[in-house]
Amino acid sequence: LKAADLLKEATKARGRLAGRVLAIGGASIDARLEPAGPEVLARRLGIEVEEVGLDEVGEAMEKVDSLEVEEELRSLARFMKLKEPVEAPVRLYLASKRLMEERRATGVTFNCFSLLPAVKCTPCIAVSKLIDEGVLAVCEAEAPTLGAAAIVHRLLGLPFFVANVAKAQGGIVLAHCTAPASLCSGSVEALPHFESGMPAALDVELKLGQVTLVALSKRLEELMVSLGKVKASSLKEEGLCRTQAFVEVGDPMDLLSSSPGGHLVLAYGDLRLSLRKAAEALSLDFREVGEKVLR
């Protein structure tokens, strides 16, 4: 492409990424560390992070109408096995939507481990619901994860699952406490949150099939991707977050040694070409990891 065309593509990509994202409970400790803080996220990707304090979150939850909560509980019960009381998580979901409307935000991220003790519940239901409503919603308020998820969600228009690598043996086991129901092939269960025991984490039985794993480097300069296949889900392994999936990758050790740490963003399909183009438009380096070809 000519320089003028590259500039046009870059401007278009940044325009689609740009917007205000609320950090409910504040930005995480990791996100405050330079060079991967909110300021770098704004400069490189045009994503503005606005912190929302714990007192404000609590007040917003108190203002949620009980009738709205009851209506949402009935809606959840149509597709979710509610093995855990979820009134408080539903209040947090509805309060988050209201805060976004009031502050004209287009996305939200949650500082989970400052939030949980304050509101006595998790944002897992909120994250799951908001992603399926077309909102950029991300756990744990980390700048690299937020940036990678924004690229997948806003540039490619896809729902996503943010997860930790819990194990690596013949593949990798990804685990986290929520995923959008649109990625589900079977059941969705609300269970006690693994680390805290609070309500509620989700066990989402993810669809089997080809996926792309995505991560941004700590300096937000390099986009790393790996092709994989979800071979099993809803593993129900003890000692792990509730949504679990075994993912076959070409070279698990290369993936682990090459990735920046933290979370991976999973989306369905072979997205390597689209992500390469996105990286070029955003002036990011691009690297494929886990390079053995999967048949």
List each model region and its residues:
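C-terminal catalytic subdomain
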Residues: G134-L235
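A short, gly/pro- and small-residue-rich
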Residues: K120-A137
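Extended hydrophobic packing segments that form well-structured cores
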Residues: A201-R295
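Flexible, glycine/charged-enriched surface loops at secondary-structure junctions
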Residues: V49-V52, N111, L158-N164, E288-V293
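A charged, amphipathic alpha-helical module
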Residues: L7-C121
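A short acidic, often aromatic-flanked loop/helix-cap motif at beta-alpha or helix-coil junctions
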Residues: L1-A3, D55-M61, A168-G170, L294-R295
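Predominant activation on well-ordered alpha-helical scaffold segments within soluble catalytic domains
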Residues: E39-A42, Y93-K97, T145-H153, L275-A279
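Internal, active-site/partner-interface "lid" segment
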Residues: L1-S28, F160-L183
